[in-house]
Amino acid sequence: YITCLFRGARCRVYSGRSCCFGYYCRRDFPGSIFGTCSRRNF
């Protein structure tokens, strides 16, 4: 089963384990592959 990550969860930008719908992996800093799940701004 696929679990998604909620806001504030640690994530990797290029990983299959992604943030929940409506969220995205915001990089810690430009060029980083690590980040934190944050709400998308539509």
Curated annotation (Swiss-Prot):
InterPro entries: Tachystatin_B (IPR020957). The keyword Secreted applies. GO terms for biological process: defense response to bacterium; defense response to fungus; killing of cells of another organism. The keyword Nuclease does not apply. It is found in: Secreted. Keywords: Antibiotic, Antimicrobial, Disulfide bond, Fungicide, Knottin, Secreted. GO terms for cellular component: extracellular region. Granular hemocytes, small secretory granules. It comes from the Eukaryota. Disulfide bonds join C4-C20, C11-C25, C19-C37. The presence of a 'disulfide through disulfide knot' structurally defines this protein as a knottin. This is Tachystatin-B2.
